[in-house]
């Protein structure tokens, strides 16, 4: 969701460039989309490289978690699919690439959105393929049982993990640690 508005702006910038160069609308849209795909791929490659090669003065690497998988816009879907494809490709020299650890990827599964015939079938398939080849991403169910699912069902909010398994306690907009009323999310 965070990358969606930036992806849309980037696409529009590419589209305007190709239209101003005289390309027909359909061709301009096709080439602009390919440019956006390449930008997304390079952006996620850059993330992975930096998060796994730049350590602190103590030698620590940033432990970053990225949750994805629920955005139904074409830009949100593209971002999630490209992120998964980059992870699947790995980092390193050709022929010796390995999947990296950071950022930790978490796929948010919703039985109403994912699977055959559902709005995010392509995103779900990209997640399955990435898992098949790399053991990543981790999967959290928004419609199953457990803390994440219960918070999502009750408040419509997604709780992302910090690092491996730590989740922040809910913070309610008006009540803080405890909800002010049934509508406080």
Language-model features: locations:
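Conserved catalytic cores of very large enzyme subunits
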Residues: 1-185
């Amino acid at each position: 969701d965070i990358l969606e508005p930036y992806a849309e702006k980037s696409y529009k910038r590419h589209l305007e460039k190709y239209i101003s160069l005289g390309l027909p609308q359909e061709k301009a849209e096709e080439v602009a989309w390919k440019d956006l795909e390449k930008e997304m791929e390079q952006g996620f490659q850059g993330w992975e490289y930096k998060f796994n090669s730049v350590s602190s003065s103590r030698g620590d690497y940033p432990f970053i978690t990225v949750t994805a998988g629920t955005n139904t816009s074409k830009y949100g879907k593209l971002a999630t699919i490209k992120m998964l494809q980059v992870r699947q490709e790995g980092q390193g020299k050709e022929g010796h690439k390995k999947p990296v650890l950071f950022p930790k990827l978490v796929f948010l599964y919703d039985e109403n959105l994912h699977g055959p015939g559902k709005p995010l079938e392509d995103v779900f398939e990209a997640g399955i393929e990435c898992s098949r080849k790399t053991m990543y991403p981790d999967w959290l169910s928004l419609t199953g049982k457990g803390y994440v699912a219960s918070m999502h069902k009750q408040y419509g909010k997604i709780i992302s993990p910090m690092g491996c398994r730590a989740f922040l306690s809910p913070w309610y907009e008006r009540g803080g640690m405890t909800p002010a009323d049934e509508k406080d999310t």
